A protein has these predicted regions:
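Short glycine-centered helix-capping/turn motifs at secondary-structure transition points
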Residues: 110, 194, 253-256
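Short, amphipathic alpha-helical interaction segments positioned at domain boundaries
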Residues: 127-171, 178-185, 189-192, 204-246, ...
Length: 307
């Protein structure tokens, strides 16, 4: 693998662009200043901890004093330029990637489940996503997605929901399920948590709200967690990895922001990290989902981005 033909070259192109922003989340997602009625703190931490705990390897055991971020917030934080405070204009994967994170987060919190494979052994991509618990999570985006899931009958598949929530469906009746201004709303969450700040930048003909990084430690911890997962703490067994970290690696790759975490690595470590990421992407997701204590929702989300 020639790093200069991949990561470095792409980063130069990205850094040279200035016409990007947070609001490009679907064809109708163009407003950068959408005002939210409020962001509640996560009131579901206990359930989340129980669902994500792994007795073999728990990479979050030292995170009690750290800022708690959702999977969506972590992926967005990876994609944001630290000083500029916006995502790359050239990244057309982050929109759907963030919607996948939303479904995975709902799976972590026990709000959704995948229908049983049954006697016909249905594959992950055709099994329906079912509402398991419609209790509010305390997160505006998650609760909005839950509301859409509750209103939909018959249930839909995970790939369909990623399309609906992204607004990338050809079915006009499903456009009402689009989650709008996702990047801006997640950025505001990170502002409230003290990770980002809010500024106005002028781009020739228009002003744009940006969210530069203020908590460098939070970003450093996130990058370190990803690097260690595929380097010093690599276990070569997805079943032994912390589930949330596994989801972060795969969905950051789906959102095309994973390489941002590998930028500081040496060439040798970079190539090793990318080989191990490829190992995860090449797993038999159907077999992994069938293992005891597996969360089929997660594997269905992963499969939706690697089909």
């Amino acid at each position: 693998m020639n790093r200069t033909d991949g990561l470095v070259q792409r980063r130069r192109v990205v850094n040279s662009s200035s016409g990007s922003g947070l609001g490009q989340d679907g064809s109708n997602d163009i407003s950068h200043n959408d005002k939210l009625s409020g962001h509640g703190m996560d009131t579901d931490c206990t359930m989340q901890k129980d669902l994500n705990s792994n007795p073999k390897i728990d990479e979050s055991q030292d995170s009690d004093k750290e800022t708690r971020l959702t999977l969506m917030e972590e992926v967005l934080l990876l994609g944001l330029k630290d000083k500029e405070g916006y995502t790359s204009f050239w990244n057309d994967c982050i929109s759907s990637g963030l919607r996948g994170c939303i479904l995975a987060e709902l799976g972590f919190r026990g709000r959704v489940e995948l229908e049983k494979a049954g006697m016909r052994k249905k594959g992950l991509l055709v099994r329906k996503l079912l509402l398991k618990n419609d209790a509010p999570t305390g997160d505006v985006l998650l609760d909005e997605a839950l509301k859409h899931l509750k209103e939909t009958d018959p249930p839909e598949t995970v790939p369909s929901w990623i399309e609906y929530l992204s607004g990338e469906t050809w079915n006009p009746l499903k456009l009402r399920y689009q989650l709008k201004n996702v990047r801006e709303r997640l950025a505001k969450n990170l502002v409230e948590k003290g990770v980002l700040t809010t500024e106005k930048q002028n781009f020739l003909l228009f002003d744009m709200t940006t969210h530069p990084l203020t908590d460098n430690l939070a970003k450093s911890r996130l990058v370190k967690k990803i690097q260690e997962a595929v380097l010093s703490r690599w276990v070569n067994d997805a079943g032994r990895m912390d589930r949330r970290t596994l989801a972060l690696v795969i969905l950051a790759h789906a959102a095309d922001v994973l390489e941002n975490a590998f930028a500081p690595l040496s060439d040798d470590d970079y190539e090793l990290a990318m080989r191990r990421v490829r190992t995860l992407l090449d797993l038999d997701f159907e077999a992994e989902a069938a293992k005891p204590n597996a969360n089929p929702v997660l594997w269905a989300v992963f499969a939706a981005f690697t089909k």
